[in-house]
């Protein structure tokens, strides 16, 4: 069976991930007119720039959908977001600022939950608005086929017939008007935005040029912290975790994780926390650039890692970072539910997150400027009395340290021998000043 359909399968049911925007509206109407039977599925991901979800399925029906469903994905999205925090599943960082993989998390949830809903309706052909140059086309492909092995893919933007007729936004708008729908194109921004409850991605158009900065972006989850005219008073916030799960903000407990994430977004968003500018490597190995917002994820991540460093030992923390980066890359590639990802997730959640219980107090200022004011946990292995510089009882004596340092003589001797061995091989040059071989000035190599 052919998995990807290059042309519209007339007479068959086609599920379309319907956002209500111009692209999917025109595609749905066009498919109906060409003889297909479109079913519209809209994911409620708590997008901060969407204020009326119920209106989206109604519009789909007006444009010719056989049926239209709104699928509430918020609970599952937040659950996956918390799992990513527990595992440190983030691999794109620049200058200490993190991209929290909010779009890949949204695709993992959308790609599985919408296809599951389609399967319930007997719809086994799926279309969405992803383009052939991006990451989403592969993410949706993987998650769709994982959920429904009989699934076939039809994307209008891969169909030359659709492209020839409605290849641009102007053509789509004219098509909608000609069909009796007063659909005007929205005012074109200098960039494109995609969002869900966990974060927002701003990319493309002017942001493809590296001389366009964050200053052209109008945040939808935070504030323009770079604008000195925007008043942002400092604010103290306390975050509490129990066994790796965020349960309270400023002393207020939450039985609903969705409400907790919304409050975390509000707190972090007041300061512009979690906004970053990243150059990343797409799945196809081409580089792209994005401006990201994730105020709630950033707030929880900072508090979580503060507790992590105070509770776990050095090697466990090293494995958390190493495995977290591996897992983050798998998540980015659309492999969040693959066996290798599940293996990493299980280890990190079972042996690392389960011990993260405690409370962290921070002072948030502008953007990513913050201070940690206090860290409290019954699980802390940080014990100031063990290494105090003041006179008092200690868990080891000066003689103990002398013995420990003496044991280092063996590897120091080995290292000296290696350095002189490298010098004999011509890899290092001797230094009259220190008596130790040194790396030769590369500019003089071979002269």
Swiss-Prot record:
Catalytic activity as recorded in UniProt: L-citrulline + L-aspartate + ATP = 2-(N(omega)-L-arginino)succinate + AMP + diphosphate + H(+)
Record-linked InterPro entries: Arg_succ_synth_type2_subfam, Arginosuc_syn_C, Arginosuc_syn_N, Arginosuc_synth, Arginosuc_synth_CS, Arginosuc_synth_type_1_subfam, AS_cat/multimer_dom_body, AS_multimer_C_tail
GO aspect biological process, one term: urea cycle
Residues given in the record as L-citrulline binding sites: 99, 135, 139, 192, 201, 203, 280
PROSITE patterns reported for this sequence: ARGININOSUCCIN_SYN_1, ARGININOSUCCIN_SYN_2
GO molecular function: argininosuccinate synthase activity; ATP binding; protein homodimerization activity
Family as reported in the entry's similarity comment: Belongs to the argininosuccinate synthase family. Type 2 subfamily.
Record-given protein name: Argininosuccinate synthase
UniProt organism field: Salmonella newport (strain SL254)
Lineage of the species this protein comes from: Bacteria, Pseudomonadati, Pseudomonadota, Gammaproteobacteria, Enterobacterales
């Amino acid at each position: 069976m052919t998995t990807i359909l290059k042309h519209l399968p007339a007479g068959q049911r086609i599920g379309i991930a319907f956002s209500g925007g111009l692209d999917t509206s025109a595609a749905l109407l066009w498919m109906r007119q060409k003889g297909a039977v479109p079913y519209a599925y809209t994911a409620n991901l708590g997008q901060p720039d969407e204020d009326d979800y119920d209106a989206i399925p109604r519009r789909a029906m007006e444009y010719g959908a056989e049926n239209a469903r709104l699928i509430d994905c918020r609970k599952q999205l937040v659950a996956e977001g918390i799992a990513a925090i527990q595992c440190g599943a983030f691999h794109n960082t620049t200058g200490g600022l993190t991209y929290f993989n909010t779009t890949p998390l949204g695709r993992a949830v959308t790609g599985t939950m919408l296809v599951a809903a389609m399967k319930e309706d007997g719809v086994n052909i799926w279309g969405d608005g992803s383009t052939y140059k991006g990451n989403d086309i592969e993410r949706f492909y993987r998650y769709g086929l994982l959920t429904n092995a009989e699934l076939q893919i039809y994307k209008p933007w891969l169909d030359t017939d659709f492209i020839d007729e409605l290849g641009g936004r102007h053509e789509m708008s004219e098509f909608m008007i000609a069909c009796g729908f007063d659909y005007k194109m929205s005012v074109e921004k200098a960039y494109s935005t995609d969002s869900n409850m966990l974060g927002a991605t701003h990319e493309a158009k002017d942001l493809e040029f590296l001389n366009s900065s964050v200053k052209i972006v109008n945040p939808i989850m935070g504030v323009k912290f770079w604008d000195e005219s925007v008043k942002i008073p400092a604010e103290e916030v306390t975050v509490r975790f129990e066994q790796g799960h965020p349960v309270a903000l400023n002393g207020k407990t939450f039985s609903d994780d969705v409400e907790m994430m919304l409050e975390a977004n509000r707190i972090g968003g007041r300061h512009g926390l979690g906004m970053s500018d990243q150059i990343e490597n797409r799945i196809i190995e081409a580089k792209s650039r994005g401006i990201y917002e994730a105020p709630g994820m950033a707030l929880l991540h900072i508090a979580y890692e503060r507790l992590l460093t105070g509770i776990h030992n050095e090697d466990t923390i090293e494995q958390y970072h190493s495995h977290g980066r591996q897992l983050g890359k798998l998540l980015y590639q659309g492999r969040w539910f693959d066996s290798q990802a599940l293996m990493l997730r299980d280890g990190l959640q079972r042996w690392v997150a389960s011990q993260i219980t405690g409370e962290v107090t921070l002072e948030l200022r502008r953007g990513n400027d913050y201070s940690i004011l206090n860290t409290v946990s019954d699980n802390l292995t940080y014990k100031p009395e063990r290494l105090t510089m003041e006179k008092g009882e200690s868990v080891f004596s000066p003689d103990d340290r002398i013995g420990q340092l003496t044991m280092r003589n063996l590897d120091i001797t080995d290292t000296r021998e290696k350095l002189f061995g490298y010098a004999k091989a011509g890899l290092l040059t001797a230094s009259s000043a220190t008596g130790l071989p040194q790396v030769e000035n590369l500019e003089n190599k071979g002269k």
